C-alpha cells in the first residue's frame, strides 16, 4: 500500500507516546462490557462517534501508535510499514458499515473522524453527518467557492497546497487545494465548529480506535460531560481520557461493534463499491472512410488516473477483419480507420486492478457513424441504487449501468458506473463478526441477561436457534465456540 500521507508529513520528533502495549479484556469481561455498551447505545438520544486509526487497521491500513504503527516503526528506524493492498482500494471495515446502519436507523447523529483515509465517505455515511478534522487524502476543495471534490485517486499533496486541477464551476475556476493537514496546519474551522457543537449536544460520545493524544481534537469528547453526557472508549491501548470515561473497553473494535450490533438486532450492510469511467468516441470523415479515436478516461478529467483499471481490451465480435487490441497505458486511447457505411459493435472489457472484487467487466458499444446517438441524463441516485441492489442480490461485482450520454455530430461521450467490489459482514464465516453462538447458553437459547439488556423478543430469534442446532448436530458446544 502507498502510505503517502505518512510519507508526506513534515518531520516531527515529538509525536507523543508510541509503541504502547496492547491490552485485551478477558472474554468474560469483554462480553459484559459489550452488553453494557449495547444498552448505552440503545438508550442514547444523541449518539456521536469519534474515530481514529484503529477502526481502519482491519482494512489493511496501519495505525500510528500501535506496536507496528507508522510512528512506532519510524522511531525505531524501520521506516513506513507496508500494507496489504493499494490505499485507494482499501475497503470500509465492519465498524464503518455498522456506523452507516446506526445512522440510517436514526441512532447515530454525527461522526467525528481524525482519519484521512476517506473510508467513512466511501462507506456511504452522509457528508453532512461527518467532520473530518485532519482532512481527506482523496478530497480537494475550492478555496474560493468552497466546493468539494471527492476523487477515486489519492491527492498528490498535503498541507493545504495547490493541486493540478481547477474548480469546475464556470463562474469560479479557482485552483483547487488538498485538504490534508500537515503538523503545523490549523484544524479547519467548519469541521471544528460542527464537531464541537455535536459533542456539546451528545448524551454519549463513543470513541473508537483512537489513543486520544492529538490536541485539540482529543478534548472534544469531554465536551459532552458538561451537559451530563457520557464518554465510552474502545481501544487496544490505554488513553489519557480513560479516567473520564463511563466505560472503557480493551478489545478489537470490529469485534466489539459486531457484538453491539448483534445485541441490538441490527444488520450490518454490505459494502458495495461503484467506480466510474468516461468513454468517448470522436471521428472525422476521410473520403469513404472514417478516422475515429476511442478514449477511456476518468470522470475527474482527461489527465486524472483510473486507479481501479489495469488495462482495457477492445474487440469487435462481429467483425473478424478488425483486429482486437489491449490498451495497457493510461490514458487509454485507440485510433482506427474504418468504412463509414459498415456499423459494428465494440466490446470493451475493463480489467480491474488488485483489490477489486472481480477481475473484469465488459460493455458493448454499438457504433454507426451514419446515425447520431441521442443525449440523456438518468437519475444518478436511482441508477446507483438499482445497481447496488443487483450486486447485493447476486453477491458478486461486475455489474454496470450507463448514467448519461451526450451525442453530437462526429462525437459521443458517455459515463458508466461499474460495481468493482462487494464485501459482506453479516455472514457466519465473516472473520471480523462475532459468531452468534457466542451469545448463547449451552442449550442454544439467548442468555436472559442478553434479552433483558436489549429488550429482545425470544420469538424473533429463529436464526440464533438454527445456528445452535447446527452446532449440536456437529457435536459442538455453542457456548464455547472461538470468536
Swiss-Prot record:
GO terms for cellular component: nucleus. Gene3D superfamilies: 2.20.28.200, TPP-binding domain (3.40.50.1220). Residues 27-267 form the Deacetylase sirtuin-type domain. The keyword Hydrolase does not apply. PANTHER family: NAD-DEPENDENT PROTEIN DEACYLASE SIRTUIN-5, MITOCHONDRIAL-RELATED, NAD-DEPENDENT PROTEIN DEACYLASE SIRTUIN-6. This is NAD-dependent protein deacetylase SRT1. SUPFAM superfamilies: DHS-like NAD/FAD-binding domain. Binds 1 zinc ion per subunit. The gene is SRT1. Its cofactor is Zn(2+). Disruption phenotype: Enhances histone H3K9 acetylation on transposable elements and promoters of hypersensitive response (HR)-related genes. This leads to increased HR-related gene expression, hydrogen peroxide production, DNA fragmentation, and programmed cell death. Keywords: Metal-binding, NAD, Nucleus, Transferase, Zinc. The active site is at 134 (proton acceptor).
Amino acid at each position: 500500500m502507498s502510505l503517502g500521507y505518512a510519507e508526506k508529513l513534515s518531520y516531527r520528533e515529538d509525536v507523543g507516546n508510541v509503541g504502547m502495549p496492547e491490552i485485551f479484556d478477558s472474554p468474560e469481561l469483554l462480553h459484559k462490557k459489550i452488553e453494557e455498551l449495547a444498552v448505552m447505545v440503545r438508550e442514547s438520544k444523541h449518539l456521536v462517534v469519534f474515530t481514529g486509526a484503529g477502526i481502519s487497521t482491519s482494512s489493511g491500513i496501519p495505525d500510528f501508535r500501535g506496536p507496528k504503527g507508522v510512528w512506532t516503526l519510524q522511531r525505531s528506524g524501520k521506516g513506513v510499514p507496508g500494507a496489504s493492498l493499494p490505499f485507494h482500494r482499501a475497503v470500509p471495515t465492519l465498524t464503518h458499515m455498522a456506523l452507516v446502519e446506526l445512522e440510517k436507523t436514526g441512532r447515530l447523529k454525527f461522526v467525528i473522524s481524525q482519519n484521512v483515509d476517506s473510508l467513512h465517505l466511501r462507506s456511504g455515511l452522509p457528508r453532512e453527518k461527518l467532520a473530518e478534522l485532519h482532512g481527506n487524502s482523496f478530497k480537494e476543495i475550492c478555496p474560493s467557492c468552497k466546493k468539494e471534490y471527492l476523487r477515486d485517486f489519492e491527492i498528490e499533496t498535503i498541507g493545504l497546497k495547490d493541486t493540478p486541477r481547477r474548480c469546475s464551476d464556470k463562474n469560479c475556476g479557482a485552483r483547487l487545494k488538498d485538504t490534508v493537514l500537515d503538523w503545523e496546519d490549523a484544524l479547519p474551522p467548519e469541521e471544528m465548529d460542527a464537531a464541537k457543537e455535536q459533542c456539546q449536544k451528545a448524551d454519549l460520545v463513543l470513541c473508537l480506535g483512537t489513543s486520544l493524544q492529538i490536541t485539540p481534537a482529543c478534548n472534544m469528547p469531554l465536551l459532552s460531560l458538561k451537559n451530563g453526557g457520557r464518554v465510552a472508549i474502545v481501544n487496544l491501548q490505554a488513553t489519557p481520557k480513560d479516567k473520564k470515561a463511563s466505560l472503557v473497553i480493551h478489545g478489537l473494535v470490529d469485534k466489539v461493534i459486531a457484538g453491539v450490533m448483534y445485541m441490538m438486532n441490527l444488520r450490518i450492510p454490505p459494502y458495495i463499491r461503484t467506480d466510474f469511467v468516461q468513454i468517448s468516441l470522436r471521428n472525422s470523415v476521410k473520403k469513404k472512410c472514417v478516422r475515429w479515436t476511442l478514449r477511456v478516461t476518468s470522470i475527474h478529467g482527461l489527465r486524472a488516473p483510473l486507479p481501479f483499471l489495469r488495462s482495457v481490451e477492445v474487440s469487435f465480435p462481429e467483425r473478424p477483419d478488425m483486429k482486437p487490441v489491449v490498451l495497457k497505458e493510461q490514458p487509454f486511447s485507440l485510433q482506427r480507420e474504418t468504412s463509414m457505411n459498415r456499423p459494428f459493435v465494440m466490446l470493451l472489457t475493463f480489467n480491474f486492478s488488485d483489490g477489486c472484487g472481480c477481475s473484469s467487466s465488459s460493455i458493448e458499444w454499438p457504433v454507426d457513424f451514419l446515425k447520431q446517438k441521442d443525449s440523456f441524463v438518468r437519475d444518478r441516485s436511482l441508477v446507483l441504487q438499482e445497481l447496488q441492489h443487483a450486486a447485493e442480490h447476486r453477491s458478486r461485482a461486475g455489474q454496470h449501468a450507463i448514467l448519461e450520454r451526450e451525442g453530437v455530430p462526429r462525437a459521443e461521450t458517455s459515463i458508466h458506473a461499474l460495481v468493482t467490489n462487494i464485501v459482506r459482514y453479516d455472514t457466519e464465516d465473516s472473520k471480523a463478526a462475532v459468531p452468534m453462538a457466542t451469545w448463547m447458553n449451552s442449550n442454544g437459547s439467548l442468555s436472559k441477561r442478553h434479552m433483558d439488556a436489549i429488550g429482545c423478543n425470544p420469538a424473533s430469534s429463529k436464526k440464533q436457534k438454527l445456528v445452535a442446532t447446527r452446532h449440536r448436530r456437529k457435536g459442538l458446544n455453542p457456548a464455547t465456540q472461538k470468536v
